Each structure stands twice: as structure tokens, then as C-alpha cells.
């Protein structure tokens, strides 16, 4: 049986720019309330007692991170990220070589709920592979004609899930799978896809659909609404 209740390290790839936000400032440094999106995302991880360290992979030319309180936080380590997400995650994993389990969380996903995080972390009691937070697809899904704004066909939504983060895996397994997948030229869109490529089947842990990733300008107001609602609920 897998080890239980071990301390967990987290990796947050934050070297991207996010051009779809249509701003000069990288999206992770946009503010919601009195904190940046990155700060909201990291603090949600550190709020759980099992998460003892967070490694943030930033762009080598990043001058904004040093201005944040996170830069002096005793549980934060900063590493240089790479050109692609997988490169940044690997850099983060190298910084926590002794960790047994690691979370990987999007820098621009600030609305993580603690009950979702707790359910995800609990899978380490019985799993040797790990899993991800995910939300069942509820809308009707259409596949488009290649290169056209026209419907090709309807996709059966049964058993379809939206992949969320955090994603949670044994550190050595994730490192080995990412390294192999990249070396063999596989397309890696998230950490789970690297494990899938290597023949593993991570668990799906249902999470809240409001755990959104801020990708487009309209997402900022929505994330602010969700965060404000959560704060009010916690104070009630």
C-alpha cells in the first residue's frame, strides 16, 4: 500500500505569458483584490497542512516576482522555467528531488477549494499512480470541421471530463514519464498526459467547476466573483 499522510511539495509553472489575455502584463501577475492571481493560487496550496513547500518556475527575465511578498516566503523556492510548461515542471521537480508526492498547479487557477484539494491529496493513501482534479462535461460537445466554423458532429459527452489542476503524482513517476514523453516527441498538454503516454491511468477526482483557469479577459471578473463569494462563505 502507498505511504499515507506524507508531506507534499507543489510545483507551479509560472513562466508563461498568456497572450490571449490581451495585456502587456503576464496573466499570473494581474490582480484580483489586493493579491495577484499567482498569490491566490499559491496561497490556496499552502493553506493545506500537508503542503510544506511550493516551487515556482518563472521566466529567467521575470522582474515582477521579486516584488511580491511570495519572494520572501520561507516555504517558497523559485527556479528558472523553460519555454514549455513541461520544461518548467521538470525544473520544479528537480528542485524537490527528495519529495515522494508532488502537486502541479496552474499559476492562473486561483479559485481552488480546500475540500477539493483535500480529496485529491487523500488518494495517496491507496494509489501508486496519482490523479487529477476534474469536472464532468455537462454541455453538449461539438467537433468542428477542420479549418471551418462549422459542426462536423456531436461528441458523446458520457465519460468526458474537463481536466483541472492540481494534478497529484508520485514525484519519481511523474519525472520519469515527463522525461520519456518529451524525449520521444510526444504531445504533452498536462502532466496526466505524460503518464497516459507511458501506459498509466491516473484517477479522476471530481472537483468544482468554478476552479477556473484565467485565460481570457472575461475570466478575470468571473474569478473575482468566485473568490469574493468564497471569502464571504468562510467568514459566515
UniProtKB/Swiss-Prot annotation:
Site note Transition state stabilizer, residues:
20, 27
Q: Which InterPro entries would you find in this protein's record?
A: IspD (IPR001228), IspD/TarI (IPR034683), IspD/TarI_cytidylyltransf_bact (IPR050088), ISPD_synthase_CS (IPR018294), Nucleotide-diphossugar_trans (IPR029044)
Q: Which cysteines in this chain are paired by disulphide bridges? A: none
Subunit-structure text: Homodimer.
**Pathway assigned to this chain's UniProt record:** Isoprenoid biosynthesis; isopentenyl diphosphate biosynthesis via DXP pathway; isopentenyl diphosphate from 1-deoxy-D-xylulose 5-phosphate: step 2/6
Coiled-coil boundaries: none
Single GO BP term: isopentenyl diphosphate biosynthetic process, methylerythritol 4-phosphate pathway
Function per UniProt: Catalyzes the formation of 4-diphosphocytidyl-2-C-methyl-D-erythritol from CTP and 2-C-methyl-D-erythritol 4-phosphate (MEP).
Residues carrying the site annotation Positions MEP for the nucleophilic attack = 157, 213
Xref: Gene3D superfamilies: Spore Coat Polysaccharide Biosynthesis Protein SpsA, Chain A
- UniProtKB keywords: Isoprene biosynthesis, Nucleotidyltransferase, Transferase
Gene that codes for this? ispD
The protein's name: 2-C-methyl-D-erythritol 4-phosphate cytidylyltransferase
Task: Write down the chemical reaction(s) this protein catalyses.
Answer: 2-C-methyl-D-erythritol 4-phosphate + CTP + H(+) = 4-CDP-2-C-methyl-D-erythritol + diphosphate
Tell me the GO molecular function terms: 2-C-methyl-D-erythritol 4-phosphate cytidylyltransferase activity
What top-level branch of life does the organism fall under?
A: Bacteria
- The EC code for this enzyme is 2.7.7.60
Q: Which organism is it from?
A: Salmonella typhimurium (strain LT2 / SGSC1412 / ATCC 700720)
Q: Which family does it belong to?
A: Belongs to the IspD/TarI cytidylyltransferase family. IspD subfamily.
Amino acid at each position: 500500500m502507498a505511504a499515507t499522510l506524507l508531506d507534499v511539495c507543489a510545483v507551479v509553472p509560472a513562466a508563461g505569458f498568456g497572450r490571449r489575455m490581451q495585456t502587456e502584463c503576464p496573466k499570473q501577475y494581474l490582480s484580483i483584490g489586493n493579491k495577484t492571481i499567482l498569490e491566490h493560487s499559491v496561497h490556496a496550496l499552502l493553506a493545506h497542512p500537508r503542503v510544506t513547500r511550493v516551487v515556482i518556475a518563472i521566466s529567467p527575465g521575470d522582474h515582477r516576482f521579486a516584488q511580491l511578498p511570495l519572494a520572501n516566503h520561507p516555504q517558497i523556492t523559485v527556479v528558472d522555467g523553460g519555454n514549455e510548461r513541461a520544461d518548467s515542471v521538470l525544473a520544479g521537480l528537480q528542485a524537490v528531488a527528495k519529495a515522494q508526492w508532488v502537486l502541479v498547479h496552474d499559476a492562473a487557477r486561483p479559485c481552488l477549494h480546500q475540500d477539493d484539494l483535500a480529496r485529491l491529496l487523500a488518494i495517496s493513501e491507496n494509489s501508486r499512480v496519482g490523479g487529477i482534479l476534474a469536472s464532468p462535461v455537462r454541455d453538449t460537445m461539438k467537433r468542428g470541421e477542420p479549418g471551418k466554423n462549422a459542426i462536423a458532429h456531436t461528441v458523446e459527452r458520457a465519460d468526458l471530463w474537463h481536466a483541472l489542476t492540481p494534478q497529484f503524482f508520485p514525484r519519481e513517476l511523474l519525472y520519469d514519464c515527463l522525461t520519456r514523453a518529451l524525449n520521444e516527441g510526444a504531445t504533452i498538454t498536462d502532466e496526466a498526459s505524460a503518464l497516459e503516454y507511458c501506459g498509466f491511468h491516473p484517477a479522476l477526482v471530481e472537483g468544482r467547476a468554478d476552479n477556473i483557469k484565467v485565460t481570457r479577459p472575461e475570466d478575470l471578473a468571473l474569478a473575482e466573483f468566485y473568490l469574493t463569494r468564497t471569502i464571504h462563505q468562510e467568514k459566515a
